[in-house]
């Protein structure tokens, strides 16, 4: 994601995990993007930085449990689905869906229900991130962000300094206008 606090814009990009890209440690040899994770967060950041020719200053990493915890701590999120589909015991409609953490995780993980598989899953993950951003920027959440973050301790890892989080929260409370969130999904075929 690229976040511009001055223009209140967020750019989200989904890159399929099975894309073959040069890893930052591979001397130009291509491997699946997902394999960058084997070498740690710095290799992931450097590989994405090389791929898109952008500087990546911070990371935010969580696992499935952390994702569920965050969505539940927010009181659920609203996601907009491109399709009506089912995933396990959950059904989703085309359009707006109100989801708790477990349902949001099912929404984000499903790929077999779609002709485009992992590509649609990536789009659904972007929709969930939008839902989280929209919810976390609500004044009711921001007024208690410190206790919110404390309650979620251990649910995620980030290199974003607490001071920067505080600045962003104060700016959002001062100017409660919505953020412009744009998302793109990379597409393509192999050589």
Give names to the regions the model predicted.
Residues 1-191:
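Non-catalytic, solvent-exposed segments at the cell envelope interface
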């Amino acid at each position: 994601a690229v976040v511009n606090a001055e223009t209140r814009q967020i750019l989200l990009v989904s890159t399929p995990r099975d894309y073959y890209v040069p890893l930052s440690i591979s001397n130009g040899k291509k491997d699946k993007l997902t394999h960058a994770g084997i070498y740690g967060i710095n290799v992931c950041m450097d590989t994405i930085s090389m791929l898109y020719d952008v500087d990546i200053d911070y990371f935010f990493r969580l696992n499935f449990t952390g994702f569920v915890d965050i969505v539940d701590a927010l009181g659920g999120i609203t996601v907009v689905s491109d399709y009506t589909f089912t995933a396990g015991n959950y059904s989703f409609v085309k359009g707006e869906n109100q989801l708790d953490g477990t349902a949001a995780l099912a929404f984000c993980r499903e790929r077999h229900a779609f002709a485009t598989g992992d590509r649609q899953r990536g789009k659904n993950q972007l929709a969930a991130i939008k839902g989280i951003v929209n919810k976390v920027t609500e004044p009711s959440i921001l007024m208690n962000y410190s206790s919110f973050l404390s309650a979620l301790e251990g649910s995620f890892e980030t290199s974003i300094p607490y001071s920067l989080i505080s600045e962003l929260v104060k700016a959002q409370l001062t100017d409660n206008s919505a953020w412009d969130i744009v998302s793109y999904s990379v597409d393509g075929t192999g050589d």
